[in-house]
A protein has these predicted regions:
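Extracytoplasmic gate region of multi-pass secondary transporters
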Residues: 49-50, 239-297, 387-391
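Conserved MFS/SLC helix-loop-helix module at the cytosolic interface between two early adjacent transmembrane helices
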Residues: 80-119
Length: 442
């Protein structure tokens, strides 16, 4: 029997060209790419509220808190779905789970584009969260079955980098498309494209090399199909660990704050404190998304290369806290400083995302779905809580003015809102320090 030696890089064959469908080393990259495109769409949808904020507030006649709740409807259902997602990914497999999710969230996107009332928009965005909730964990479950353990942190980083790419698409490109075609036709078109890719996932993805009729890859522990009782047993083991809860709190704070910055309040903050247009302000969140594009794979590669995890989390956390501290303490920082903070915030979140590799390494491959889903649920619960919390803080300092139907807030109001975010990141850093103490590198 031929056993393929895996490599994190796409192999180059000198003697002959092997089909993408029959070479397991190439097949895994083909399928990962398709899953990554679907995950890109999830992130585009979930971060789209920032550049559409004025249009949504005017179109649905809502306040800052109302907009925060509309934005957060995605994340509440996304967070609640994480444990069921882990069970589905381990029990039904990533192929079926990802295909079903892609269909559901793109139907939600089409519904959001057609919504005429706040309540329909709320339900449609929640539907996007329902379907989108399964894509990330399904992709990580696929990686656990097709890549070696010493490649997982890198693959986790590359997958999260796709979130950054989706975030980039949700900034200036989305703003330009909304200006050119209108936000409703743009969202509708993206939903149609997403449905097409749902079909591609079903056609190409397989849960493991063996289920694709291919030879196994050397040193890859393929998770077997589990009974429901086995999955629940794994879940109980994951929930029994203190490390699980510490990582969950850390991701609740760190991820929740960044998604709130890039996905909602980051653009209005720049517009109202720097006096620029929405399109110009979207360049700042684009920088944050670019940081998210390069940070996680860089941290992941360093973690795999030098066998370090928790030390990187602490180092990244210190930089993260410093950046938000400036936004909290300085009423209107220089534009260059704001741009740098947005970029470094996205990049240093990559350090915190190493916790997915930490939790996965503590459990068998067969439990990778429930282990990563558990902590991922906390991350997106934070993304649901912080938009509304910061929105209430901003509404307290509303000037009483509106511009194009959107509320105008004071600089001090933004400082209070960012103070909430900074406090949360300090908590995340403390969690990282605890992990470094309990699980020292090496």
């Amino acid at each position: 029997m031929t056993v393929w030696r895996g490599s994190i890089f796409i192999p180059v064959r000198v003697c002959h060209v092997v089909s993408l469908r029959t070479d397991p080393l190439r097949r895994r990259w083909l399928v990962w790419t398709v899953l990554a495109i679907v995950f890109l769409l999830v992130n585009l949808y979930r971060l789209s509220s920032a550049v559409l904020a004025d249009r949504l507030m005017a179109g649905f006649n809502t306040t800052g808190a109302g907009l925060g709740t509309l934005h957060a409807s995605f994340f509440y259902i996304y967070a609640l779905m994480q444990l069921p997602t882990g069970i589905l990914a381990d029990r039904a497999g990533p192929r079926k789970t990802a295909t079903a999710g892609a269909i559901v969230f793109n139907v939600g996107a089409i519904g959001f584009a057609l919504a005429q009332t706040y309540h329909v928009a709320f339900l449609s965005r929640a539907l996007i969260g329902l379907g989108g909730a399964v894509i990330f964990i399904s992709t990580l479950r696929f990686c656990a079955n097709w890549f070696r353990a010493d490649e997982f942190a890198t693959m986790n980083g590359l997958t999260i980098a796709i979130a950054g790419l989706g975030g980039i698409m949700a900034t200036t490109p989305l703003a330009l498309a909304a200006n050119a075609f209108g936000w409703r036709p743009t969202m509708f078109g993206l939903g149609v494209v997403g449905l097409l890719f749902a079909g591609v996932v079903w056609l190409l993805a397989r849960d493991s090399p063996e289920s694709a009729g291919l030879e196994p890859i050397e040193d890859v522990e393929t998770g077997t199909t589990l009974t429901l009782e086995e999955v629940l047993q794994n879940l109980r083991a994951v929930l029994a660990e203190r490390e699980t809860w510490v990582i969950s709190l850390m991701l609740f704070c760190s991820t929740g704050v960044l998604i709130t910055l890039l996905g909602l309040w980051g653009v209005p903050y720049v517009v109202q404190t720097q006096g620029v247009s929405v399109t110009t302000a979207s360049y700042y969140t684009l920088l944050g998304s670019f940081g998210l594009l390069v940070g996680p794979p860089t941290f992941g590669w360093v973690a795999d290369r030098f066998e370090t995890r928790t030390g990187l989390i602490v180092g990244g956390g210190i930089v993260y806290v410093a950046g938000f501290g400036v936004l909290t303490l300085v009423p209107s920082p220089h534009q260059g400083i704001v741009a740098l903070i947005y970029f470094t915030s996205g990049a240093t979140l990559g350090a915190f995302t190493l916790s997915y590799a930490v939790i996965k390494d503590r459990h068998a491959t067969a439990a990778s779905g429930v282990s990563t889903a558990t902590v991922n649920g906390a991350a997106f619960l934070g993304a649901a809580v912080f938009p509304t919390a910061m929105g209430y803080a901003l509404d307290t300092y509303w000037t009483g003015e509106t511009v194009a139907g959107s509320r105008v807030y004071t600089e001090f109001g933004y400082q209070v809102a960012f103070g909430i975010a900074t406090a949360a990141i300090v908590v995340a850093l403390c969690c990282g320090l605890w992990l470094h103490w309990k699980l020292p590198d090496g």
